[in-house]
């Protein structure tokens, strides 16, 4: 597999397509990141105060610009999740390799954001199945980690289906703030 920061791969199944995010995704993504019911499921740990609530086209465009810049700088990759039956973008997946002084050093961090109507175990499992098998090779990581709040019951079921296990270890941000609620897959 080529370097993910030189050529972003696409992944697909009968229902879903994961492809690199594009500026033209803004209108669809506004429905995701402007969805107040989806907001509690977004992982904004260590994101400098951004809570990922983008309720205007201007804010959504600004976020996408940052995602594209971050890819160019090799900070993280952001895939759009396309529902093939509607040809609509229903969310994103962000991944990167974390280098740190804590238990999450050399972990592939997986952030999965979908609209609230897609926050269902079976849907999340289908989407995760497209990227998880490739994650270790793409990011040369020793484990995957994803945040699952205690109220995210459907998300927890999807993660358990892959063998993710809840950990009590804290992810420590660059400013020393510690975050809990992570699940690990090795």
Q: Which role fits each region the language model picked out?
A:
Residues 121-134, 161:
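Conserved acetyl-CoA-binding loop-helix of GNAT-fold acetyltransferases
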């Amino acid at each position: 597999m080529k370097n993910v920061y030189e050529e972003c791969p696409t992944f697909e199944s009968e229902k879903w397509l994961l492809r690199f995010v594009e500026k033209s995704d803004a209108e669809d993504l506004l429905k995701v990141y402007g969805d107040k019911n989806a907001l509690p499921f977004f992982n904004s740990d260590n994101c400098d105060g951004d809570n990922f609530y983008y309720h205007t086209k201007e804010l959504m465009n600004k976020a996408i610009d940052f995602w594209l810049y971050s890819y160019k700088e090799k900070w993280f990759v952001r895939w759009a999740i396309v529902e093939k039956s509607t040809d609509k973008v229903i969310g994103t997946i962000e991944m990167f390799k974390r280098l740190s002084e804590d238990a999450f050093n050399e972990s592939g961090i997986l952030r999965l954001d979908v609209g609230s109507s897609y926050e269902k175990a079976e849907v999340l499992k289908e989407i995760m199945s497209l990227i998880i098998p490739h994650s270790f090779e793409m990011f040369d990581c020793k484990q995957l980690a994803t945040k699952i709040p205690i109220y995210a019951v459907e998300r927890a079921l999807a993660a358990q289906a892959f063998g993710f296990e809840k950990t009590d270890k804290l992810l420590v941000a660059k400013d020393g703030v510690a975050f809990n609620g992570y699940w690990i897959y090795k």
